[in-house]
Amino acid sequence: GCFEDWSRCSPSTASATGVLWRSCDSYCKVCFKADRGECYDSPSLNCPHRLPNNKQCRCINARTAKDNRNPTCWA
């Protein structure tokens, strides 16, 4: 369904980011100790009409595995 394609970079969900749903850049820096996070084009295969211009998050130079002890990294 749509959830598999939905990401912290999806334009339609970007306004919903915040404490519980970090932006791509914040997610990568905090959860992976990465230099930065960037969004790249990733057309939705499951939900193209609900997620036009879909994007996914990519962490640049991640130094650690995801910090699962931090609740804001779980999503």
UniProtKB/Swiss-Prot annotation:
Entry keyword annotation includes Flavoprotein: no
Subcellular localization(s) per the UniProt record: Secreted
GO cellular component: extracellular region
Transmembrane regions: none
Main subcellular location: secreted
Superkingdom per UniProt: Eukaryota
One Pfam entry name: Macin
Disulfide topology: 2-9, 24-28, 31-73, 39-47, 57-59
Gene3D superfamilies: 3.30.30.100
Keywords for the protein's UniProt record, in alphabetical order: Antimicrobial, Disulfide bond, Secreted
Keyword DNA repair: no
Single GO biological process annotation from the record: defense response
Similarity comment text for this entry: Belongs to the macin family.
Function: Has a bactericial activity.
Protein name (Swiss-Prot/TrEMBL): Theromacin
The organism of origin for this protein: Hirudo medicinalis
